[in-house]
Each structure stands twice: as C-alpha cells, then as structure tokens.
Regions:
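Glycine-rich phosphate/pyrophosphate-binding loop and the adjoining helix
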Residues: 161-163
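A structural micro-motif
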Residues: 1, 27, 49-50, 87-88, ...
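Short alpha-helical
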Residues: 10, 37-38, 72-73, 96, ...
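Predominant activation on well-ordered alpha-helical scaffold segments within soluble catalytic domains
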Residues: 16-17, 75, 102, 137
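Solvent-exposed, charged/polar functional surfaces in cytosolic regulatory/catalytic domains
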Residues: 18, 41, 76, 80, ...
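Internal alpha-helical scaffold of NAD(P)-dependent oxidoreductase catalytic cores
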Residues: 100-110, 125-159
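Rossmann-like NAD(P)(H) cofactor-binding subdomain of soluble oxidoreductases
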Residues: 38, 46, 54-129
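NAD(P)+-binding Rossmann beta1-loop-alpha1 motif at the extreme N-terminus of oxidoreductases
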Residues: 1-53, 57, 61, 124
Length: 163
C-alpha cells in the first residue's frame, strides 16, 4: 500500500506518526514539503517516507491520497492536480463536501471525508469518517476509534463537535 499526504500540518503529521507506530502494512508514505519542519521531522522517522515538492508527484506515486490542506488552499491545489480512476481520496478539509471533492478529484471515484484529531500520533484519535469504507476505516482503527457518520449532514454535525 502506498499512501500519499498532501499537506503536512498538525493533523497529517499526527496521522502519519500514528500509522508508523501501528502494524499497518505500508510500503511507502509520500508526503509534501508544504510544512518543511514537519516533513523533515517525519522523514527522519522512517525510510518509508519520501518527501516531494510537487503534489502531482505524490498523487502519481500513491494509491490512497490524504488531503490535509487549509480550506482556502485545498480547492486551488486540487484543481491543478490530475488523479487516477482507481485512487482513493481521503479529505481532512472540513469545508469541501463530497460532491465538490468528486469534481475536484475526478476521475477518482472513491472519496471519503475523515476528521482525525492530533491524538492520532498516540493511537488515541476518535476519527469521524463518511462514507464508510472498509480499508480506510481499518487504517484509522490503527490510530484510535472510528465513528462512521450515517450521511453527510450528520458528518458535518460531528465535525463541528470535534473541532
């Protein structure tokens, strides 16, 4: 499994640290240089981590792409990226709904929203996901508990409560 992370802020860094401590069978973790401090720190933790300056390089080398960008930056960045049909996109961006993400990440069809918390680094994060996806749920279960929202409206309410 090759994971890609666009954006390396607090949440993304916590998720990666948690996954590295877990028993996840990850072949490679491709990350962006967006936060130079965090990306360098992560690279030192594992030889599985590769740092790229271009988001497209991360997308081209990953089967599951996690989007951990600020809302204002996410739309702009995703518009210029080219995704593949079989890729799974997991968005940590609160303001982008599934419909918008499907448009921005086309032709990728599998889009999941996820709201992990910084405790993911210690495998203590309650993570909200929508819609349910077996593989993504199992990844987040490695870094804490998972709550699957019934629909996007419930997902949005749960996100507000977790922030």
């Amino acid at each position: 499994m090759k994971l890609g992370f666009i954006g390396t802020g607090t949440i993304t860094t916590s998720v990666i640290e948690g996954l590295l401590k877990s028993k996840a069978k990850i072949g490679q973790i491709n990350i962006s240089k967006r936060s130079k401090k965090n990306s360098l720190k992560l690279r030192k933790k594992s030889k599985k981590i590769k740092v790229y300056s271009k988001n497209q390089d991360i997308i081209d080398k990953s089967s599951i792409i996690f989007v951990g960008l600020l809302p204002k930056v996410a739309t702009k960045e995703l518009k210029i990226c080219k995704f593949k049909k079989g890729q799974i996109i997991v968005s940590f961006v609160s303001t982008l709904n599934i419909k918008n993400l499907k448009t921005l990440c086309n032709p990728a069809k599998v889009i999941i929203k996820a709201a992990p918390l910084p405790m993911a680094s210690d495998s203590l994060s309650p993570t909200i996901i929508f819609p349910n996806h077996r593989l993504i749920k199992s990844l987040f279960e490695l870094i804490g508990s998972v709550v699957v929202a019934k629909n996007e409206k419930q997902n949005n309410h749960l996100w507000v409560m977790s922030s």
